[in-house]
Regions:
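Class I Rossmann-like S-adenosyl-L-methionine
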Residues: 1-142
Length: 142
């Protein structure tokens, strides 16, 4: 299981009401991971939680309701990496599509298309949101 799959599991547990700090501490105590891996998991996990309103807004603009929690978490992680981290676009898109292929080739292609479209549109999108709604841009509940 790779790091993104583990982050997906952590986010699913968080959505069930478990405390983020407890989840992360338990994960680190039960798994042997390097310092860079720990930093990556921490950044992505807390980053997705911190920007949940923004990420869900962007996902819902490009997809109908994503029914599978796993895929929604995967999109959240990938959108976060594309927007807030200096992650290589090709790597994020490829890894997202590969993880989604567990649900079938068509799902992998769907995720690939959604991520590529978002990457092309994100700069204009961020400017547009900045002008329209700071609550969405900064994930501040209204």
């Amino acid at each position: 299981m790779n790091l993104k799959e583990r982050i997906i599991e952590l986010l699913e547990e968080f959505e069930k009401g478990k405390y983020s700090n407890v989840l992360l501490n338990d994960y680190f105590n039960k798994n042997k991971i390097t310092a860079p891996e720990k930093a990556f998991v921490t950044e992505v996990f807390y980053g997705v939680i911190r920007n949940l309103i923004f990420l869900d807004y962007e996902i819902e603009k490009r997809t109908k309701k994503v029914k599978k929690s796993y895929l929604k978490q995967l999109l959240r992680i990938s959108f976060y990496q594309l927007t807030f981290m200096n992650s290589e676009t090709k790597a994020v898109v490829w890894e997202g599509a590969e993880l989604a292929k567990k649900y079938g080739d068509a799902i992998g292609k769907f995720i690939n298309g959604v991520l590529r479209t978002y990457d092309r549109e994100k700069e204009a999108e961020l400017k547009d949101i900045e002008n329209k709604s700071w609550a969405i841009r900064y994930s501040y509940p209204e």
